[in-house]
């Protein structure tokens, strides 16, 4: 297996991780077909609790 030639500092490590998070979160959002709120793909809606047409978490049904 490959081994690192030098220790990666905490600052350099955190800068690399910050770029990944910024790109992945901002680019991919879809609208929930049940309530219309933006949500992450392939996950239950945080506002209404629906996923693929089913209520998977208990939320208020006032949407």
Swiss-Prot record:
- Keyword Membrane in record: no
Q: Which cysteines are joined by disulfide bonds?
A: none
Cellular component per GO?
A: large ribosomal subunit
Q: Where is the composition biased (Basic residues)?
A: 7-18
**What UniProt keywords are attached to this protein's entry?**
Ribonucleoprotein, Ribosomal protein
Molecular function (Gene Ontology), one example: structural constituent of ribosome
Q: Please give the SUPFAM superfamilies that the UniProt record associates with this protein.
A: Zn-binding ribosomal proteins
- Region (Disordered), start-end ranges: 1-23
Q: Does the keyword Ribosomal protein apply?
A: yes
Q: Which InterPro entries match?
A: Ribosomal_bL32, Ribosomal_bL32_bact, Ribosomal_zn-bd
One Pfam family matching this protein: Ribosomal_L32p
For biological process, the GO terms are: translation
Q: In terms of domain of life, where is this protein from?
A: Bacteria
PANTHER family xref list = 50S RIBOSOMAL PROTEIN L32 (PTHR35534), LARGE RIBOSOMAL SUBUNIT PROTEIN BL32 (PTHR35534:SF1)
Which HAMAP family does the annotation name? Ribosomal_bL32 (MF_00340)
Give the family per the record: Belongs to the bacterial ribosomal protein bL32 family.
Report what the protein is called: Large ribosomal subunit protein bL32
Give the organism the record lists: Chlorobium phaeobacteroides (strain BS1)
The organism that produces this protein has a lineage beginning with: Bacteria, Pseudomonadati, Chlorobiota, Chlorobiia, Chlorobiales
């Amino acid at each position: 297996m490959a081994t690192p030639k030098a220790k990666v500092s905490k600052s350099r490590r955190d800068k690399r991780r910050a770029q990944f998070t910024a790109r992945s979160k901002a680019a991919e959002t879809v609208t929930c077909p049940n309530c219309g709120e933006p949500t992450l793909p392939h996950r239950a809606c945080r506002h209404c609790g629906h996923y693929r047409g089913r209520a998977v978490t208990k939320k208020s049904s006032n949407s």
